[in-house]
Amino acid sequence: MKKMLAVTLAVLMAGIVAGCGTKTESSAAAETETAAVKSEASDTEQAQESQEPSASGDPIRIGLTTVLTGDRSLEGEYASNAAKIITEEINTQGGVLGRPIEIVIEDALGTDVGAVNAYRKLASDDSIVAIVGPDSSNDGMAQSPSALEFKILTTAQGSSPTLKNMCNNDNPYLFQLRACDDTLCAALIKYSVEELGIKSYAVMHDTETSSADQARLFTEALKSYGIEPVVTVPFTTGTKDFSSHIAQVQASGADAIIGAAFQTEAAILIQQIRSLGIEAPILGSNGFADPVTIQLAGELNDNVYCASAWVPNTPNPKGAALAEKYKELYGDDCGKAAAQIYDHISLICEAITLAGSTDREAVREAMNTIGDYQGAITKYDCRTNGDCGRGGLLVKVVKGKAEIISEITSEKVIE
């Protein structure tokens, strides 16, 4: 079921402020729902008007496609929460071009078809200035032709090299804001061979496109060390019983297991491997250290290594501030999907500011002038082409807690 959530400023502010124990009232300057907002620091303190400039006028509307229903609906929950946080921050600081922003959310349903339908509904609305795509390379690639058709700036959350190629060569309206899997997978294999001393590997991967791509990249990185996987075991999205797959891995005698899958399947896979008493290191694609995976797998998520875009205990000050605010408002650790949405909306607003306009083409052109932009996750540089994300984190998960080993950087040369 597709859902349309036209998120107005008043709704966003009510949700955010209620979450942190404050209350809001409309300013005397305007009586509409998009009025500037006063805040009270606490019930025992005298209310003071914000000294920030107020946003007024018609809202600047930004579309967001995310998964609100189905097995991946936790992603949509994180995304929606982050949209509220960044909207409240921007609007209380004067908005963009002096106007408030409004995030319009469509349910991508967790399928390629759902992602395209959600995207086209937003793109066909002339009031939408730019669109944030869902947390999947597959969905981003499926949306790419529509982005080109409607000529609207679209940010993709996926990390596939195939998506990267689309952004750099095929579609000037599509921007990949995560460090690419080719960088992340190579970094994880390098660490496992050179630091952990692992000699033999089994590969288990989902057959959907992005996970299969990650498995291929892991395998290519192993080959650069003269290592071939002792066994490769594919499975399909939605698999709940991995016993036969794990049996193949056990029979192979591999020292470590490489896994490539989305968060739900990753969590089930980890649970079942550890429940069988297998203690071998698991080297996972970026979702294996995500709070969604950790929440689902719990303490069984142990001795798991991952090259990830994000963990809540990030050393990045801007990311740490977001993680703290998210925890305060929602009681949960800030997931990758939330951090990505926060950065995507921030970058789009930066492009609108640089353009000095809400014209779609002007905003897209302005996006290509952004360089060295510090987000919550990493720095972004969009000046030469459409892949903008520059870094990640090498992480070890110990009994459900992500510990950062080192930062991963992917420098971009500006000519």
Please provide the spans of the model-predicted regions.
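Sec-dependent N-terminal signal peptides of Gram-positive bacterial secreted proteins and lipoproteins
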Residues: 3-23
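Bacterial lipoprotein signal-peptidase II cleavage site
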Residues: 18-30, 37
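Immediate post-signal peptide segment of exported/extracytoplasmic ligand-binding proteins
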Residues: 36-38, 43-66, 92-101, 193-199
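Extracytoplasmic "Venus flytrap"
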Residues: 54-56, 60-82, 106-113, 135-136, ...
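Beta-alpha junction/loop-to-helix N-cap segments that form part of ligand/metal-binding clefts
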Residues: 74-81, 93-166, 235-240, 263-267, ...
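Extracytoplasmic ligand/sensor domains, especially the bilobed periplasmic-binding protein
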Residues: 128-231, 279-305
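Segments of small-molecule ligand-sensing domains
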Residues: 328-338, 349-404
